[in-house]
């Protein structure tokens, strides 16, 4: 059975509002990560992929809450003839100030090539408890030499 290693480049664009009600803004986070990948391969481009990984992020705006954060994402997708339209998952951003923000996402694309999707910020901890927002993400897959893992520039 062929092992497929999916590597993700995510560029996150969003608008969001903060729990204090006084601040809102946009973010554009990028970084690098590693993902543990599980694959059930049925052949001819048909397979299911699940992943769990972490990434370190920076934002082009240094005062963004997502600048110098990390994220853990767990998700999955089903490929049919090499394409997917059902990617779903959830991420937890661990922020520099010790708080966390959670988002869920959906996506579509082509296995081994990349994809696009949308996300919704659903909640946070502490001062970000009521944070909300939506955004767009895109990625380009890269190759990894570690079996069962993928690496990414997010």
Show the residue positions of the predicted features.
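Beta-strand-enriched cores of mature, soluble protein domains
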Residues: 20-154
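N-terminal signal peptide c-region/cleavage motif recognized by signal peptidases
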Residues: 14-16
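Positively charged n-region of N-terminal signal peptides that target proteins for export
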Residues: 1-5
């Amino acid at each position: 059975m062929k092992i497929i290693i999916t590597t993700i480049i995510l560029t996150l664009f969003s608008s969001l509002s903060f729990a204090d009600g006084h601040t809102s803004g946009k973010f554009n986070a990028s970084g690098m990560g590693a993902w543990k990948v599980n694959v059930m391969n049925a052949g001819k481009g048909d397979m299911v992929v699940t992943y769990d990984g972490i990434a370190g992020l920076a934002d082009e705006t240094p005062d963004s809450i997502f600048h110098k954060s990390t994220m853990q994402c767990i998700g999955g997708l089903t490929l049919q003839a090499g394409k997917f339209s059902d990617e779903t998952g959830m991420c937890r951003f661990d922020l520099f100030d010790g708080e966390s923000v959670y988002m869920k996402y959906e996506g579509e694309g082509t296995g081994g090539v990349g994809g696009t999707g949308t996300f919704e910020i659903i909640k946070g901890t502490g001062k970000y408890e009521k944070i909300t927002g939506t955004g767009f993400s895109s990625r380009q897959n890269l190759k990894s030499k570690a079996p069962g893992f993928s690496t990414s520039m997010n």
